[in-house]
């Protein structure tokens, strides 16, 4: 073996062992050269578990594998750790994909993986299982009939045929396909074994049943022979207790999966099923089916592990079942390997850590072959260590792969990519670090010289392990030419730079402490001396954070008058601006800093630790802790309240009335009983009121008897033999307790004894007392008070009201009608003589409608007529009139009937010409012929109006034309409609204009045959 060693050149050797043991050595330029930027295979697609249906007509199956690599990778496949014979006609490769023609279960079922390799190494894909799916038919034998007494539970066994895989779904046919059983609380189909369970059999269950099995993996379904079910009638069905027959077992679930538990019970009556997690709340993702028999937990997590219980219960008894869900976890990376380059001869610890449940084990592959187990450490690496590595973390539930390429670097020192700075500046009295960072592998040894003098470590000079040179307490004599030498077993190199000594930067005018009040301005001075050959900048920081003058220019401003002056102006200072300000004067060589404190006096900060104690009906005790006084003593505290009925905070009355600044407890008084409150505390000093504390938790004061009487007590009116009493309900804040209501008291005006009734609805303000013996329009005294569970409140002032008057007893006479059109009828009548009439009501309904659906029109007692509108054309209507007052309506008049007229013509007049003649327009239209169900045309109405307005001049004519004046300015609209006994028909319109024409020309002739409007001027 020969090794090429070039000084100042990089040698990267990538060694790969792939199936046969070949070794490649590659030589590179400085780092990875332009002509060689290769890398080992990186998988982009890997094979997955595949189920091939045995009855498939496709005749082939594909396992995919694709990797990215430079140069392009070569692919191989292995099955059950043996090479796949790609020379066989049964196998072919499409890219990296393996295609198996005419798959055979005996030959092809097994575990496959793909190998991708190039001259950098080889990687192995994840393993994939190729299996063959099938679902055999049910046996051809007939199923025996099943006889069950009504009211008893029963199970029909599915007994599915041989199959793979196990992900079957089950349904049951009733009598014929595709009539499937609907699951409910009484009937259940287990998706675990396929059995049909009926909690108690009914006569309606009679029929022939077949188990219908589907395999979604191979898209095949089969069904069993039909099982006759014959319920045996019972004179009386006996109840029996719940008996759980579908029981879930302990489950091992993988985190992130969906878990289904089944629980079903027989019993009469049908048992109710309840689910719970023992000693813990149910998972938030849990769902229970409508029937209650299925519990599904979606996206199960580790914290969902535990014991789950289902309980079935009916009136005769209950049954319970418990089992545990164990939640396991697929491996997941905590830390994995990545492509790495290391120096030859160095050590490498390659961390590869995974979590999972159970805890995964770690094993390693190198170039596709087993290499190591557990933690991987390489010592004194050589070229033989280069290659493609794979870290595999696996537990019971699967494996995850992390792939990486390890390259070994061998390089003589070179400064070509990173030479020393030609000029290094350092301040007198300061410290400088001169970097020396050549590329080299293995790591070189470093030495330094100044001019012709070799440097060694001393109290001022230190050569770092990475080659950097540190000089402390710099003097003018330290200036000069410095050279760094680097040497390893592959060569040596050096680089030179010049150290220039500058004057140090010094703060000559430092900021001083300041004390201001909120809203005032403050100035922080700062000036510095520095080397005139350098540029000086000032940086201000506040409490350790650099001030951004662009974002914070509202409050911060710098003085740029002199280069050596970095004065800071703080404008309109707020409490948040109090703290330590640091001025840093800096050049590219060094810096100097000085600090000062700014005190901002202002209103106090918010009190803390607010607590509510000793809650009573109208007061509560509060305690709190002092907040910041912001450099001005707190003089007093204010307690504020907010009720559930308001969004506004209000100052509360307190005991003591004035809460001194040294107090940390007080009572809020004069509160509303049985009211929800929040409280907060505000501190005040000579500079103002501060921020409020965080509001307390909402509390409710104790209840108390009402102390406010209802207002606006009155009433009267209503129906016959009624006394209506009204009041203004008390608002929620005056309820003062639970079970709030009203006590209504009333008596005849000259009576002695008050009658009292209780109204329990707190929101009502009305009570109606009915008494058939009550005389109409009788005076009563009434009063109202509120009550709650704590007692009664005061009565309101006594009000005097009258009981309801009697409804009118006379019916209107001389009722008549006049049919106005197809949609309107006018009704008139003679007034009744009774004085108690307040209004008249007209009831009307079409002959084809029921009287109960009658429409009503109400008019005042002064009216003698009313108009009924929006009626149907050519329709018979029945009409009656009654006199009314607040007690109701009296007897109706004799019912009369009327027929609306036929509908007006639906055909609009067709305007055939609009001719200008001198100072007038002549508009002509065709005669409108009414249909058989329409009113005969009796004439025409013409509306002449300005365009855009609704009002104008209305003309009536029996002719088919009309003359209208030429508009003086603007456009006018001429609307023409037919008129009939049934009303006005549909409108036609034409626009005319008074604008002059350029010459006598066509101006206004409508050619009827072609629908063309042409104009003529004479």
From Swiss-Prot:
GO MF annotations, alphabetized: carbohydrate binding; cell-cell adhesion mediator activity
GO cellular component: a single term: presynaptic membrane
Tissue: Strongly expressed in brain and in neuroblastoma and retinoblastoma cell lines. Lower levels of expression in lung, pancreas, kidney and skeletal muscle.
Domain Fibronectin type-III residue range list: 606-704, 709-806, 811-906, 907-1000
GO process terms (BP): axon guidance; cell adhesion; cell-cell adhesion; central nervous system myelin formation; cerebellum development; gene expression; locomotory behavior; Notch signaling pathway
SMART domains, sorted: FN3, IG, IGc2
Region (Disordered) location: 693-717
Domain Ig-like C2-type span(s) in chain numbering: 41-131, 137-223, 241-326, 331-407, 413-500, 504-601
InterPro entries named among the record's database cross-references: Contactin-1_2_Ig1, Contactin-1_Ig1, Contactin-1_Ig3, Contactin-1_Ig6, FN3_dom, FN3_sf, Ig-like_dom, Ig-like_dom_sf
Alphabetic keyword roster: Cell adhesion, Cell membrane, Disulfide bond, Glycoprotein, GPI-anchor, Immunoglobulin domain, Lipoprotein, Membrane, Notch signaling pathway, Repeat, Signal
Residues that carry a glycan: 208, 258, 338, 457, 473, 494, 521, 591, 933
UniProt signal peptide: 1-20
Disulfide partners: 65-114, 158-211, 263-310, 352-391, 436-484, 526-583
Pathological condition linked to this protein in its record: Congenital myopathy 12: A lethal, autosomal recessive, congenital myopathy characterized by fetal akinesia, neonatal hypotonia, severe muscle weakness, loss of beta2-syntrophin and alpha-dystrobrevin from the muscle sarcolemma and disruption of sarcomeres with disorganization of the Z band.
Function statement: Contactins mediate cell surface interactions during nervous system development. Involved in the formation of paranodal axo-glial junctions in myelinated peripheral nerves and in the signaling between axons and myelinating glial cells via its association with CNTNAP1. Participates in oligodendrocytes generation by acting as a ligand of NOTCH1. Its association with NOTCH1 promotes NOTCH1 activation through the released notch intracellular domain (NICD) and subsequent translocation to the nucleus. Interaction with TNR induces a repulsion of neurons and an inhibition of neurite outgrowth.
Family, similarity comment: Belongs to the immunoglobulin superfamily. Contactin family.
Protein's name in the database: Contactin-1
The organism of origin for this protein: Homo sapiens
């Amino acid at each position: 073996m020969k090794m090429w060693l070039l000084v100042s050149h990089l040698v990267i050797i990538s060694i790969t062992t792939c199936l046969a043991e070949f070794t490649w050595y590659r030589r590179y330029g400085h780092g990875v050269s332009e002509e060689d930027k290769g890398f080992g295979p990186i998988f982009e697609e890997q094979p997955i578990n595949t189920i091939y249906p045995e009855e498939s007509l496709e005749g082939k199956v594909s396992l995919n594998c694709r990797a990215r690599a430079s140069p392009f990778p070569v692919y191989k496949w292995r099955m059950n750790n043996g090479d796949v014979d790609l020379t066989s006609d049964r196998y072919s490769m499409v890219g990296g994909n393996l295609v198996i023609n005419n798959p055979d279960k005996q030959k092809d079922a097994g575990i496959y993986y793909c190998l991708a390799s190039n001259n950098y190494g080889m990687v192995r894909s994840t393993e994939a299982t190729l299996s063959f799916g099938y679902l055999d038919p049910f046996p051809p034998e007939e199923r025996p009939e099943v006889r069950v007494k009504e009211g008893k539970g029963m199970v029909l066994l599915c007994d599915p045929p041989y199959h793979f895989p196990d992900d079957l779904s089950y349904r049951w046919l009733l009598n014929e396909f595709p009539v499937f059983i609907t699951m409910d609380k009484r009937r259940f189909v287990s998706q675990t074994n396929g059995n049909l369970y009926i909690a108690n059999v009914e006569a309606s269950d009679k029929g022939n049943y077949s188990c219908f099995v589907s395999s979604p993996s191979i898209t095949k379904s089969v069904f069993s022979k039909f099982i006759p079910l014959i319920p045996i009638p019972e004179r009386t069905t006996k109840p029996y207790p719940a008996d759980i027959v579908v029981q879930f077992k302990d489950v091992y679930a993988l985190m992130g999966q969906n878990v289904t538990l089944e629980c079903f019970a027989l019993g009469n009556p049908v048992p109710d099923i309840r689910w719970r997690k023992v000693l813990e709340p149910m998972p938030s993702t849990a769902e229970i089916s409508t029937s209650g028999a299925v519990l599904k937990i979606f996206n199960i997590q580790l914290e969902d592990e535990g014991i789950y219980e289902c309980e079935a219960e009916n009136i005769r008894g209950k049954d319970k079942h418990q089992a545990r869900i164990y939640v396991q976890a697929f491996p997941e990376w905590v830390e994995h390997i990545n492509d790495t380059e290391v120096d030859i001869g160095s050590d490498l610890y390659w961390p590869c850590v995974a979590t999972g449940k159970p805890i995964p084990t770690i094993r390693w592959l190198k170039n596709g072959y087993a290499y190591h187990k557990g933690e991987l450490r390489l010592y004194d690496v050589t070229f033989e260590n280069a290659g493609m590595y794979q870290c595999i973390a696996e537990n019971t539930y699967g494996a995850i792969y992390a792939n990486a390429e390890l390259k070994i670097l061998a390089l003589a020192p070179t400064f070509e990519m990173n030479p020393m700075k030609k000029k290094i500046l350092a301040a007198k009295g300061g410290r400088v670090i001169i970097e020396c960072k050549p590329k080299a592998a293995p790591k070189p040894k470093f030495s330094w010289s100044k001019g012709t003098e070799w440097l060694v470590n001393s109290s001022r000079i230190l050569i770092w392990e990475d080659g950097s040179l540190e000089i402390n307490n710099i003097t003018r004599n330290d200036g000069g030419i410095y050279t760094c030498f680097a040497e390893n077993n592959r060569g040596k190199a050096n680089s030179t730079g010049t150290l220039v000594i500058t004057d140090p930067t010094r703060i000559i005018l430092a900021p001083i402490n300041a004390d201001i009040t909120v809203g005032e301005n403050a100035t922080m001075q700062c000036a510095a001396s520095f080397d005139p050959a350098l540029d000086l900048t000032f940086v201000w920081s506040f409490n350790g954070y650099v001030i951004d003058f662009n974002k914070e220019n509202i409050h911060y401003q710098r003085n740029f008058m002199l280069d050596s002056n970095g004065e800071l102006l703080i404008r309109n200072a707020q409490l948040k601006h109090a703290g330590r300000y640091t001025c840093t004067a800096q050049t590219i060589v060094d810096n100097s800093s000085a600090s000062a404190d700014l005190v901002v006096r202002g209103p106090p900060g918010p009190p803390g630790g607010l607590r509510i104690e000793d809650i009573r009906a109208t007061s509560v005790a509060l305690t709190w802790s002092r907040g910041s006084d912001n450099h001005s003593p707190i003089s007093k505290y204010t307690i504020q309240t907010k009720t559930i009925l308001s969004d506004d905070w209000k100052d509360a009355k307190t005991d003591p009335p004035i809460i001194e600044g040294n107090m940390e407890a007080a009572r809020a008084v004069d509160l509303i009983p049985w009211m929800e409150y929040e409280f907060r505390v505000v501190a005040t000093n000579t500079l103002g009121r501060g921020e409020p504390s965080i509001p307390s938790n909402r509390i409710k004061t104790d209840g108390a008897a009402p102390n406010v009487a209802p207002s606006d007590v009155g009433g009267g009116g209503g129906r016959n033999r009624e006394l209506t009493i009204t009041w203004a309900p008390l608002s929620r804040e005056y309820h003062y307790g639970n079970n709030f209501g009203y006590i209504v008291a009333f008596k005849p005006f000259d009576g002695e004894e008050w009658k009292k009734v209780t109204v329990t609805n707190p929101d009502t303000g009305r009570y109606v007392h009915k008494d058939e013996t009550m005389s109409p329009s009788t005076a009563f005294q009434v009063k109202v008070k509120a009550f709650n569970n704590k007692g009664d409140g005061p009565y309101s002032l006594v009000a005097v009201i009258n009981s309801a008057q009697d409804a009118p007893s006379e019916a209107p006479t001389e009722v008549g009608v006049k049919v106005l059109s197809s949609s309107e009828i006018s009704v008139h009548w003679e007034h009744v003589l009774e004085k108690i009439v307040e209004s008249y009501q007209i009831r009307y309904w079409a002959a084809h409608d029921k009287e109960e659906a009658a429409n009503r029109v109400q008019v005042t007692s002064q009216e003698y007529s009313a108009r009924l509108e929006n009626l149907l054309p050519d329709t018979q209507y029945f009409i009656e009139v009654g006199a009314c007052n607040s007690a109701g309506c009296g007897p109706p008049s004799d019912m009369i009937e009327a027929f609306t007229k036929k509908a007006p013509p639906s055909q609009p007049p067709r305007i055939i010409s609009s001719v200008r003649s001198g100072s007038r327009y002549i508009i002509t239209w065709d005669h409108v012929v009414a249909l058989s169900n329409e009113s005969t045309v009796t004439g025409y109405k013409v509306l002449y109006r300005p365009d855009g307005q609704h009002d104008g001049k209305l003309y009536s004519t029996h002719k088919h034309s009309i003359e209208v004046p030429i508009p003086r300015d603007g456009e006018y609209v001429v609307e023409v409609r037919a008129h009939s006994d049934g009303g006005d028909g549909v409108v036609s319109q034409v626009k005319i204009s008074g604008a002059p024409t350029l010459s006598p020309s066509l101006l206004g002739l409508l050619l009827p045959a072609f629908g063309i409007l042409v104009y003529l001027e004479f």
